[in-house]
Swiss-Prot record:
The gene coding this protein: ackA
Localization: Cytoplasm
Protein keywords: ATP-binding, Cytoplasm, Kinase, Magnesium, Metal-binding, Nucleotide-binding, Transferase
GO cellular component: cytoplasm
Name of protein: Acetate kinase
UniProt family annotation: Belongs to the acetokinase family.
InterPro entries: Ac/propionate_kinase (IPR004372), Aliphatic_acid_kin_short-chain (IPR000890), Aliphatic_acid_kinase_CS (IPR023865), ATPase_NBD (IPR043129)
GO MF annotations, alphabetized: acetate kinase activity; ATP binding; magnesium ion binding
Length: 397
């Protein structure tokens, strides 16, 4: 048995989960928020109870030290020697990383170089890695990339119709994201279906504030809705998803905004927030629609119709699907959104049960037993995938 920490470091946050492996028992989990501010928040779950502390955590190194101290103070580990490995979520692995990898100096340099492709995320992920290296330098650490799962996409899926030299010189192509989540839920779907994943064609719908759809054939990603960045694809909470690229200079001309300002609008003020004018949260928007708000209705219609585009496209690509999976915050918890996405898909063999669909945050088949295409709700677990990869690559006994 070995204890493994799964880490997701943001620019001002640190999410953690400690596992006993290989049993995959969660020993504790928590979150450090507002790092760098005087009123940082440290939350940890001990014996099923949340402990919350507001204190000054100036940087990630202090957050890591505090986390490790809490583990021993609360008796979750007797000593730090019990920690056998650390897994770090890294958003962008580019074309360099098609799998998770043991972190060494070369890997760190590669992640840094790839920061060009994910300027908001990779630098923060690096800070988390370095903070742990300072405190636990001899513990094996593994980088788990959001993009790695999608490295199996064929050129026909990942190339943009741009001058080929842009791809060769600048790495401009579709990378895709949420890979760890799509991998987890498709592998779990194969288990639930009782069939080898190699025999399955699956549609994975990761619907949260960020959202992406993936076509997974034989356990391999063959296409996904996000692109060079997580801005592409379906309509999201605050992100536009796909738009006509010529709109960017047009908006600049009309508003006097810089390209950076327009891109910021596309990332932070568009999507459901842009369409409604008041919220990126689907629960608020559904409530407003029930009150008769027209823009709420239109926003929800746009959200669903963009998902339909990918379901239709990927079903054609795979010549049919065996199952559609719903995961992430909205996919796991919104029966209304699932129902709207599935309505009218009988032509492709989808027959879902409204009663079975009334589930929230738990695994369930929501299709009728006779439905040729199975519909499954699967709560995602990116942290356990990270822990599994640490166990696989870290030579941990």
């Amino acid at each position: 048995m070995s204890k493994i920490i799964a880490i997701n470091a943001g620019s001002s946050s640190l999410k953690f989960q400690l596992f006993e492996m290989p049993s995959e028992t969660v020993l504790t989990k928590g979150l450090v928020e507002r790092i760098g501010l005087e009123d940082s928040i440290f939350t940890i779950t001990v014996n099923g109870e949340k402990q919350k502390e507001i204190t000054n955590i100036p940087d990630h190194a202090v957050a890591v030290n505090m986390l490790l101290k809490k583990l021993t103070e609360n008796g979750i580990v007797k000593s730090l020697d019990e920690i056998g490995g650390i897994g770090h979520r890294v958003v962008h692995g580019g074309e360099k990383f098609a799998d998770s990898v043991l972190i060494d100096a070369e890997v760190l340099a590669d992640i840094e170089e790839l920061s060009d492709l994910a300027p908001l995320h990779n630098p923060a992920n690096l800070v988390g890695i370095k903070a742990f290296q300072e405190v636990l330098p001899n513990v094996p650490a593994v980088a788990v990339f959001d993009t790695a799962f999608h490295q199996t996409m064929p050129e026909s899926a990942f190339l943009y119709s741009l001058p080929y030299e842009y791809y060769e010189k600048f790495g401009i192509r579709k990378y895709g994201f949420h890979g760890t989540s799509h991998k987890y839920v498709t592998e779990r779907a194969a288990e639930l279906l009782g069939r080898p994943i190699e025999s399955l064609s699956l549609l994975s719908c990761h619907l949260g504030n960020g959202a992406s759809i993936a076509a997974v054939e034989g356990g391999k990603s063959i296409d996904t809705s996000m692109g060079f960045t997580p801005l592409a694809g379906v309509t999201m909470g605050t992100r536009s998803g796909n738009i006509d690229p010529a709109l960017i200079p047009y908006i600049m001309e009309k508003t006097g905004q810089t390209v950076e300002e327009v891109v910021s609008v596309l990332n932070k003020k568009s999507g459901m927030l842009g369409l409604t004018g008041y919220s990126s949260d689907l629960r608020d928007i559904i409530a407003k629609e029930e009150e008769g708000d027209h823009r709420a209705k239109v926003a929800l219609d746009v959200f669903v119709s963009r998902i339909h585009k990918y379901i239709g496209s990927y079903t054609a690509r795979m010549k049919g699907v065996d199952a559609i999976i719903f995961t992430a915050g909205v996919g796991e918890n919104s029966a209304i959104i699932r129902e709207r996405v599935l309505e009218g898909l009988e032509y492709m063999g989808v027959y879902f049960d409204v009663k079975r669909n009334n589930v929230f945050g738990e695994e369930a088949f929501i299709s009728f037993p006779h439905s040729p295409v199975k519909i499954i709700v699967i709560p995602t677990d990116e942290e356990v995938m990270i822990a599994r990869d640490v166990l696989r690559l870290g030579d941990i006994g």
